[in-house]
Amino acid sequence: MVNVVDLRKTYRTSHGLDTIRVDFSGQGPALSYRPKSVNAVDGISLSISPGEVLGLVGESGCGKSTLGRVVLRLLRASAGSVEFDGVPILHQPEKALRHFRRSAQIVFQNADSSLNPRLSVGEAIERPLALFNLVPTADRRRRMEALLDMVRLPRSYQTRYPHQLSGGEKQRVAIARALATEPKFIVCDEPVSALDVSVQAVIVNLMADLRDEFNLAYLFISHDLAVVAQISDRIAVMYKGGLCEIGVTAEILRRPRHPYTEALLSSLSVVDSENESRSGRLRLFGSIEAEDEQISGCRYQARCPYKVGAICETVTPPLRQISQGHSAACHLESVPANGVAPSYANPPRS
């Protein structure tokens, strides 16, 4: 249903102190700007089948939300292609995207900013029905109440406003609004990260039930691997704009094949013995934002305890198939599997 090939989104900046070059030689201008490029999405390819949940996990700043927005054409791609039901959408005129806009929706992280404070719950849910002329005016209220039932909110809530709702209730309204157009595919962009842990589980279970009932496909984005594992059929791990690993959820959790995935698993509060790393638990040092701009080689080399030498610094590892439906982008998959212990070629950074 959704097919993404070599998708890229590059941001170019030409202002700011980090892009200023000072020339003291007197041969050129004293100050000049050096444009800087940031590859938020860097050559990603993936597919999502009808009724499938693909979880996309990674730290803040890795580009996962940007990927979701580019797939929905809320942001313009720099290169690559996205097909929905076999139809390319990236270069279609907006008028030709009406079917796509109805069939593909998004649930944002912060319902406070995605819900209009001036619209009641009922008005917010009815608005897509009017925009797409999905049901006669006389039937809109009945349809809106049915949507409230789907997300397990009392019908009396239709007269309430966002400020009168809890965080979980607001997110239920956002889900109901997304369901109003009867979509096939929903991008769930950190839909539970702003909620209490107890509420997170309830919302994730609700979304899983809706998937089963309506055969929905989700791109479920989160920084929390435990949340992603709860609902996903497959998991894709993203780092600095690219995919590190992708595979069936059970396989990713049981036998991760990329050091970054291992580190994410090790960061969970409860780790099964089968999920231990190659040589015990891995700690994740540093942050994406703290790293220098990468020129070549593996995008994870600055933090990887398994760094094997020059190949990691000079050659970008391809996403290599390890087993049926399981791929990882790591040079360790091409060296003898004799139990490589962490070398800490990069000293751990706090």
Regions found by a protein language model. Name each.
Residues 161-165, 169:
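Conserved ABC ATPase signature
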Residues 180-184:
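A short, proline-enriched helix->beta-strand linker immediately N-terminal to the Walker B motif
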Residues 187, 191-195, 199-277:
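P-loop NTP-binding/switch modules centered on Walker-like glycine-rich loops
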